[in-house]
UniProtKB/Swiss-Prot annotation:
Organism: Methanocorpusculum labreanum (strain ATCC 43576 / DSM 4855 / Z)
Protein name in UniProt: DNA polymerase sliding clamp
InterPro entries: DNA_clamp_sf, Pr_cel_nuc_antig, Pr_cel_nuc_antig_C, Pr_cel_nuc_antig_N
Signal peptide positions (record): none
Domain of life: Archaea
Length: 247
């Protein structure tokens, strides 16, 4: 059972964060809120999201799993006004989700959770560099880098504690360094890995809305991004595997 209302902006941020990587997901619902964890079809990236019941205007739920077709929900997002209140209600059969806003009422057929991939286990990674940067600065650097290349290196120097983003194309190059007040280190250590900009561009749309994004980085290891939204009542985590450089 699920019956809830939520502000349009929070609903939109929730859908955008998940749809950055996947078209469908298994949503876990209970009295504490909602959560999901899933990987993309190429097994290159993972997204996890939690949204507390307190982030909703009203929230009543019993433990259940919902199979969401994210693309269906995204298709209606342009119809939702910024000041709309979105109502969510699971029907008695558990096979349809009613989404209402601004005079519209959609009834969406849910996916059979048996057809959705099982939740992945979050890997326990040794990533020595942990730091925070403004979400908008990171996203701006990703957008700029994508104009010259399809890959980007993320690196930290233990000696200088400078975070460097470097994109090399066939003939052009973009480099962005964050130092001083723009980067806050929890642990400063040498780290460098190469990543696909296609994935980072998709993640960046949500990361760019966050005041701060925490980055955990190693050498030739996946990178982890985490940030909060909905006034700290929601959290998002991304994990992206590195691109292996040819010798």
């Amino acid at each position: 059972m699920l019956k809830a209302t939520i502000e349009a902006d929070i609903f939109r941020e929730t859908i955008d964060a998940v749809s950055a990587l996947v078209n469908e997901c298994r949503l876990h619902v209970d009295e504490k809120g909602i959560r999901t964890i899933t990987v993309d079809t190429s097994n290159v990236a993972m997204v996890s999201l939690e949204l507390s019941a307190s982030a909703f205007l009203t929230f009543a739920a019993e433990p259940c799993e919902i199979g969401l077709d994210i693309e269906k929900i995204r298709s209606m997002m342009s119809m939702i006004g910024k000041t709309d209140i979105v109502s969510l209600e699971l029907d008695e059969s558990g096979k349809k989700l009613k989404i209402s806003f601004g005079g519209y009422e959609y009834s969406i057929t849910l996916l059979d959770t048996k057809t959705i991939r099982k939740d992945p286990n979050a890997p326990n990674l040794n990533l020595p560099a942990t730091f925070e940067v403004p979400g908008v600065m990171f996203n701006d650097a990703i957008k700029a880098s994508s104009m010259v290349s399809d890959k980007i290196s993320l690196a930290v120097s233990a000696e200088t504690c400078v975070f460097t983003m470097n994109a090399d194309g066939d003939s052009d190059r973009i480099k962005r360094e964050l130092t001083g007040d723009d980067v806050h280190y929890l642990t400063c250590a040498d780290a460098r890995s190469l990543f696909s900009l296609d994935y980072l561009k998709d993640m960046g749309k949500s990361i760019g809305r966050a005041e701060k994004v925490q980055i955990r980085l190693g050498t030739d290891h996946p990178v982890q991004f985490s940030f909060v939204y909905a006034g700290g009542k929601g959290s998002v985590g991304y994990l992206l595997a590195p691109r292996i450089e040819a010798d």
